[in-house]
């Protein structure tokens, strides 16, 4: 039981469900909302309830959406021939904010991880395969994370695409813009050398 009562204890426990929020962070957030910004706390609670009630997944790309077809999939100006495959909805937002990419997306909602029981069916690979078969896609851009699981997922998807004669590309990775080689870790530098291209 919390020193300050059951309701605060439940709030602290609820806040800890967020990624990266431990006991101290949860306590700091809870005390801030209760001591300094109760109106903000009410607004947060209302916005969270509304999002939980209204948000679903787009039937085509699986991004979070309030409708069955998200605004990206409904936009006829986007290139239907390019399909960028990402792990999470936040990846779509990052790409949209940082690039001029104008194709379509497919969100896996994770990555292959057999040890954790996450196989192709959990990632919607059947829906992805259907899109590859029916959507006249000419290029699949693999933008999964550069982890062992992300690489395995990218390989699996590249096999799906290549058996259908669809060009598969992988986003570049390596030395960041403005990065100095002496400060780059060896794995990143190794990938950068392997992924070098002609100028």
UniProtKB/Swiss-Prot annotation:
One of its GO terms (biological process) is DNA recombination. A zinc finger (C4-type) spans 58-73. Pfam families: RecR_C, RecR_HhH, RecR_ZnF, Toprim_4. Residues 81-176 form the Toprim domain. One of its GO terms (molecular function) is zinc ion binding. The keyword Nucleotide-binding does not apply. SUPFAM superfamilies: Recombination protein RecR (SSF111304). Keywords: DNA damage, DNA recombination, DNA repair, Metal-binding, Zinc, Zinc-finger. The keyword Ribosomal protein does not apply. PANTHER family: RECOMBINATION PROTEIN RECR. May play a role in DNA repair. It seems to be involved in an RecBC-independent recombinational process of DNA repair. It may act with RecF and RecO. Belongs to the RecR family. NCBIfam families: recR (TIGR00615). This is Recombination protein RecR.
């Amino acid at each position: 039981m919390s020193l300050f009562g059951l309701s605060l204890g439940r709030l602290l426990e609820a806040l800890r469900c967020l990624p990266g929020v431990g006991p101290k962070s949860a306590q700091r957030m809870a005390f801030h909302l209760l001591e300094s910004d109760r109106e903000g706390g009410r607004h947060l609670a209302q916005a969270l309830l509304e999002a939980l009630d209204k948000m679903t997944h787009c039937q085509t790309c699986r991004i979070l959406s309030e409708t069955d077809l998200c605004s990206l999939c409904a936009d006829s100006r986007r290139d239907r021939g390019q399909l960028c495959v990402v792990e999470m909805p936040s990846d779509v937002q990052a790409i949209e904010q940082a690039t001029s990419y104008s194709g379509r997306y497919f969100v896996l909602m994770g990555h292959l991880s057999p040890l954790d029981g996450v196989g192709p069916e959990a990632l919607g690979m059947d829906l992805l395969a259907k899109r590859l078969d029916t959507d006249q896609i000419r290029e699949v851009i693999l933008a999964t994370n550069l982890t062992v699981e992300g690489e395995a997922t990218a390989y699996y998807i590249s096999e799906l695409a290549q058996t259908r004669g669809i060009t598969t590309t992988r986003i570049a990775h390596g030395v960041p813009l403005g990065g100095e080689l002496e400060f780059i870790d060896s794995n990143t530098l190794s990938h950068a050398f392997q992924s070098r291209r002609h100028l």
